[in-house]
Amino acid sequence: MASLENLVARYQRCFNDQSLKNSTIELEIRFQHINFLLFKTVYEALVAQEIPSTISHSIRCIKKVHHENHCREKILPSENLYFKKQPLMFFKFSEPASLGCKVSLAIEQPIRKFILDSSVLVRLKNRTTFQISDLWKIELTIVKQLMGSEVSAKLTAFKTLLFDTPEQQTAKNMMTLINPDDEYLYEIEIEYTGKPESLTAADVIKIKNTVLTLISPNHLMLTAYHQAIEFIASHILSSEILLARIKSGKWGLKRLLPQVKSMTKADYMKFYPPVGYYVTDKADGIRGIAVIQDTQIYVVADQLYSLGTTGIEPLKPTILDGEFMPEKKEFYGFDVIMYEGNLLTQQGFEIRIESLNKGIKVLQAFNIKAEMKPFISLTSADPNVLLKNFESVFKKKTRPYAIDGLILVEPGNSYLNTNTFKWKPTWDNTLDFLVRKCPESLNVPEYAPKKGFSLYLLFVGISGELFKKLALNWCPGYTKLFPVTQRNQNYFPVQFQPSDFPLAFLYYHPDTSSFSDIDGKVLEMRCLKREVNHVSWEIVKIREDRQQDLKTGGYFGNDFKTAELTWLNYMDPFSFEELAKGPSGMYFAGAKTGIYRAQTALISFIKQEIIQKISHQSWVIDLGIGKGQDLGRYLDAGIRHLVGIDKDQTALAELIYRKFSHATTRQHKHATNIYVLHQDLAEPAKEISEKVHQIYGFPKEGASSIVSNLFIHYLMKNSQQVENLAVLCHKLLQPGGMVWFTTMLGERVLELLHENRIELNEVWEARENEVVKFAIKRLFKEDILQETGQEIGVLLPFSNGDFYNEYLVNTAFLIKIFKHHGFSLVQMQSFKDWIPEFQTFSKTLYKILTEADKTWTSLFGFICLRKN
């Protein structure tokens, strides 16, 4: 692509080219992304200025010819004359506010008559030409294109619609005579009519801006805004590919900057205690970048805010990241990108922060209302000290703004790779959605109307790659709301469908709400209540500061991952006290030590082998899924839909976190759609079954398989629990569906205790190098295995030396109950039978498998049952 200056120079040379003396030389400016509303806006603006105009009608037949040199010619018969139109050069303005504006240089030459065939494109044109000066004319054209069989079928009808209107066409009545509902194309072109030698590139830019200002009075401001983002990006990004996304407008400010992550308990556990981190308050402002560029001082946020000038002398650039209060024009800096020409993006935050205050002082020197956010460096792991640190920031009364949370900043990483987390009280956790009114007449039961409410659908942004890896589908009505071109992008809107609440994207908006025109807007919303099959949402505010990001076509509210991880704080609330003491209820928080390596590898191998038996099934339910230890195995098996059920909210939150981790770091041949249900499996089977069947898309006939790995001992307290489990499995499975249990075998445990003469409250131990590796504490006195209710204490690899109590599983009784409820036993097998296969799988791990490991593994087995 040529530069604009080169194109203008080539245009001028064409008039001295003797080979072109019989050609018409055209320099045109075309706008490529024109819809009816934009067309009408420009048309009416030109009419209002009473600019001289003429109306013309034409029918042109076009035949496109492609040569070996890839030069395209258009052959155009007009008034029985035949021409070929050959493009020579073009220049395209890159800024998105220019609506794909393109400057084209072409020549038109007369040729001999050619044969019209079915490949010819027929274009009917209704054109109004406005001669805005001696140098330029603006042509606004309504076009109908016909091809092939359409020509004979529709040509006469559209000729009547476009040309033979009931009234004589004038510029003033044109837009009322043409029906915009028909599938017309709309073109705006500017043609140069002045002396070739007088034209400059600046003239082209000026006339282009004139038309764009008719479309949007803020065009020049939008152009300046985009140029400011480009300036910032040039100091942050090194990748030409990413810089091109900024220049094209596909990325706006939000996609450029590193985002603050909503912190979950699982996030916090990874670095608790947060020694070395920096903490500051979170203000309820908008993200903004303060810039000193030459003599200009401005903030780039939802728009461009000019804060003044430095005077005559230009300064070296300073770029600060922070929060901006537009009403008061106050800037609160929390990071620095560049200070007086020194790029700091590769330094750790602990170094960057030293220049942040210096940058703030530069702003203050020019009477800008700016200050550095107050940071505390966390140096102690003592919970009491941490509590005082957090309270001193969060509960401070002297800040000039309302504090709605805390920010934790990780040291040691570059600007783009610095992990920054925000913590908010549950009430202040909000999400940003692109809101669209639900199309009518969809006949979707889940979209049932409610009197006094209008149904809207909530959308967030997602990459095409993540969309595929999470096996998501577009909701009913999606194709009516978003054009095909948008759906084919690398980043597009998707309904907000978290794993634990697939219908969370439904929002019933009260007709009496003070928020009226919300369709197509980005709204900040909070969850008031989670009901059986929908969420009660409350609008906090319309994100007017995000409208410009929305126009880029690359922003649709929060990113899907960000939104779901924020949503976890409704599912598993994170209290202020837990910041100091550490998250409570973390599921099996202890880590396994190296001595368990071979034994845990063996158990993992066995579970992998079992799950592979159900590979590629459509719907699978995991009872007691915990934090998703088997998630990778389900993904490897290509399960299409996985429903995980557990009563531990914190464990389920960790599972969802793992869902995204697998999607971004591991490669799987098949995608799995993951649903989670927070549910105590000891509750009545009927209630649980109803909840599962309410999961969006769950088949009426039931799932293909139910899996429960090392969980059912929790449901062996009494026979009623076992009966309830059997009923639940029957209700959730399709006929012929399978149940797969792995469990510690009660019969084998009792045998081990008898062999070693372990009495009540005594402990059987297996040691390795004088370290207790496995242990079972006998908590019952009966000598024979009871149907239910016999407890033992178990020392687990991840229990940090503590015993976990569980019930012995009487497998004979379990199978008996399942048979009574319509199941047949397919297979029962001890884990020890897999040891030879494990040796083949990994000779290295098998060699370090000890006798204690083998003894412990022999206590476990699996049971497979089929629903009759």
UniProtKB/Swiss-Prot annotation:
Residues 594-868 form the mRNA cap 0 methyltransferase domain. Pathway: mRNA processing; mRNA capping. GO terms for cellular component: virion component. S-adenosyl-L-methionine binds at residues 607, 624, 646, 710-712. GO terms for molecular function: GTP binding; mRNA 5'-cap (guanine-N7-)-methyltransferase activity; mRNA 5'-triphosphate monophosphatase activity; mRNA guanylyltransferase activity; polynucleotide 5'-phosphatase activity; RNA binding. Its main location: virion. It comes from the Viruses. Disulfide bonds: none annotated. The record marks 627, 658, 713, 806 as: mRNA cap binding. It catalyses: a 5'-end triphospho-ribonucleoside in mRNA + H2O = a 5'-end diphospho-ribonucleoside in mRNA + phosphate + H(+); a 5'-end diphospho-ribonucleoside in mRNA + GTP + H(+) = a 5'-end (5'-triphosphoguanosine)-ribonucleoside in mRNA + diphosphate; a 5'-end (5'-triphosphoguanosine)-ribonucleoside in mRNA + S-adenosyl-L-methionine = a 5'-end (N(7)-methyl 5'-triphosphoguanosine)-ribonucleoside in mRNA + S-adenosyl-L-homocysteine. The active site is at residue 282. It is found in: Virion. Pfam families: mRNA_G-N7_MeTrfase. Part of the viral DNA-directed RNA polymerase that consists of 8 polII-like subunits (RPB1, RPB2, RPB3, RPB5, RPB6, RPB7, RPB9, RPB10), a capping enzyme and a termination factor. In the N-terminal section; belongs to the dsDNA virus mRNA guanylyltransferase family. In the C-terminal section; belongs to the class I-like SAM-binding methyltransferase superfamily. mRNA cap 0 methyltransferase family. The N-terminus contains the mRNA 5'-triphosphatase domain, the central part contains the mRNA guanylyltransferase, and C-terminus contains the methyltransferase domain. This is mRNA-capping enzyme. The lineage of its organism: Viruses, Varidnaviria, Bamfordvirae, Nucleocytoviricota, Pokkesviricetes.
